[in-house]
């Protein structure tokens, strides 16, 4: 992709009210544009990151056996009244009335819709267990949206819902999603920490949050250092993870904590996922039942959320330096930045054009007439994992310079050897 044909409205600075790194860099790098408080347009570069995260999430969800659906953003209020949850969200829920004076709402979550779907379409207990998921926009009218896309009002979420016959089956589904979430976050280049959590207005009596450590996090986490090793292990042991002490500030009690104070680690964390065992909280009041040996029983449910748009902010909080973003290769909008420092030099142009053609969709090619300094500053800000620098002195030696954006390593290499090493 040629930068001259692409749209990346970069900025040198942001306003004084932009306080966290991810908010600053997502604006300066042209990922997003604020439209209203807590509401953003995703620009081309940001949308590529969002789609890359979606693809990683979708791949692991599909591997788990979950099936993708798509539910409506606009929901009838009657379903929420039926579940008994209509008033729980208070002012966070945006309520509307259609032309026939029917009460509707913008979905802050989809437990009621998926429960209604299953109660009217599930024909046999032989279809159980089943887990359905979607990747869909949500709206919650946050009182104080802040930190850009980390805490906004409209956000992209992966939400999944499991349905089982009994408690033992529901716990198996819960543990499967627990393990799937660890895989997802590790595939994104993150080390998550799972902590026991309150269920809040979602409900249920078993819940875990997944956090990534970051100084800008809103939660304070208390944990046994062993949890980091368990989360990074190739062999994911769910029971050991569950039994290793971790807690957010609202669940941590120093008086009852089983870990000696000098063994407890304390860090700030950003919540990036949340899983719940719901039991029959929704199925019972909404009569979502299944028949087994002529006996009608409420479905046992679980729900599982990942904030996909929030993950963009969390990843920037973890992967950045004082020059800009340092994207992990797995989700970077492009794998390579190609920078021709001398856009009027025929030999430099020839080498750059050849690399652009060879790398195709994996490269953002800065073919502008801007000065070398501006180009290098911009490519550091945008944060692609590999920078290919085309300069006159190196081209004369039939070499190009390659820089690793993350660890700052750089080396000279011929185009031929580079393509052998890096081209898919």
From Swiss-Prot:
Per the UniProt record, one Pfam family is: tRNA-synt_2b
Query: What's its catalytic activity?
Result: tRNA(Pro) + L-proline + ATP = L-prolyl-tRNA(Pro) + AMP + diphosphate
State the coiled-coil residue ranges. none
Is this entry keyworded Electron transport? no
The record's EC number reads 6.1.1.15
Cited PROSITE patterns: AA_TRNA_LIGASE_II (PS50862)
Recorded hits in Gene3D superfamilies, A to Z, give: Anticodon-binding domain, Bira Bifunctional Protein, Domain 2
For this UniProt record, the keywords arranged alphabetically read as follows: Aminoacyl-tRNA synthetase, ATP-binding, Cytoplasm, Ligase, Nucleotide-binding, Protein biosynthesis
Q: Name one GO biological process term.
A: prolyl-tRNA aminoacylation
Instruction: Note the SS bond partners.
Output: none
GO cellular component terms listed in the entry, alphabetical order? cytosol
Q: GO molecular-function annotation terms?
A: ATP binding; proline-tRNA ligase activity
Q: Where in the cell is it found?
A: Cytoplasm
Report which superkingdom the organism of origin falls in: Bacteria
Name the PANTHER family on file: MITOCHONDRIAL RIBOSOME PROTEIN L39/PROLYL-TRNA LIGASE FAMILY MEMBER (PTHR42753), PROLINE--TRNA LIGASE (PTHR42753:SF2)
Family to which this protein belongs: Belongs to the class-II aminoacyl-tRNA synthetase family. ProS type 2 subfamily.
Job description of the protein: Catalyzes the attachment of proline to tRNA(Pro) in a two-step reaction: proline is first activated by ATP to form Pro-AMP and then transferred to the acceptor end of tRNA(Pro).
Q: How does it assemble?
A: Homodimer.
Q: What is this protein called?
A: Proline--tRNA ligase
């Amino acid at each position: 992709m040629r930068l001259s044909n692409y749209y990346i409205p970069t900025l040198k600075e942001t306003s004084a009210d932009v306080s966290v790194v991810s908010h600053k860099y997502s604006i300066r790098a042209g990922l997003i544009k604020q439209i209203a408080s807590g509401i953003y347009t995703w620009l081309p570069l940001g949308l590529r990151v969002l789609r890359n995260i979606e693809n990683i999430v979708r791949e692991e969800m599909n591997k788990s056996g979950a099936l993708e659906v798509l539910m409506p953003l606009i929901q009838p209020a009657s379903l929420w009244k039926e579940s008994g949850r209509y008033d729980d969200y208070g002012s966070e829920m945006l309520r509307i009335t259609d032309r026939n004076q029917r009460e509707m709402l913008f979905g802050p979550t989809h437990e009621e819709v998926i429960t209604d779907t299953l109660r009217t379409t599930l024909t046999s207990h032989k279809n159980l267990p089943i887990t359905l998921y979607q990747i869909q926009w949500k709206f919650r009218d946050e009182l104080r949206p802040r930190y850009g896309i980390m805490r906004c009002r409209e956000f992209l979420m992966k939400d999944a819902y499991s349905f089982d016959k009994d408690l033992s089956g529901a716990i198996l589904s819960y543990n499967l999603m627990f393990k799937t979430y660890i895989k997802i976050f590790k595939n994104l280049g993150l080390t998550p920490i799972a902590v026991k959590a309150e269920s809040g207005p979602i409900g249920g009596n078993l819940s875990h949050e997944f956090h990534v450590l970051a100084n800008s996090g809103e939660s304070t986490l208390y944990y046994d250092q062993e949890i980091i090793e368990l989360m990074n292990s190739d062999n994911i042991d769910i029971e050991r993870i569950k039994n290793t002490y971790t807690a957010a500030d609202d669940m941590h009690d120093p008086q009852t904590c089983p870990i000696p104070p000098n063994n407890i680690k304390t860090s700030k964390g950003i919540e990036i996922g949340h899983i719940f065992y719901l039991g029959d909280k929704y199925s019972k009041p909404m009569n979502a039942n299944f028949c087994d040996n002529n006996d009608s029983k409420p479905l046992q449910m679980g729900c599982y959320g990942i904030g996909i748009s929030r993950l963009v902010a969390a990843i920037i909080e973890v992967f950045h330096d004082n020059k800009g973003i340092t994207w992990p290769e797995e989700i970077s909008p492009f794998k390579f930045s190609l920078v021709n420092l001398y856009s009027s030099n025929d030999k430099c142009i020839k080498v750059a054009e050849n690399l652009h053609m060879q790398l195709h969709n994996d490269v953002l090619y800065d073919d502008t007439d801007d000065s070398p300094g501006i180009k290098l500053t911009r490519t550091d800000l945008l944060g692609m994992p590999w920078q290919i620098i085309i300069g006159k002195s190196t081209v004369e030696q039939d070499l190009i310079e390659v820089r690793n954006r993350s660890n700052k390593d750089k080396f000279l290499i011929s185009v031929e050897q580079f393509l052998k090493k890096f081209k898919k």
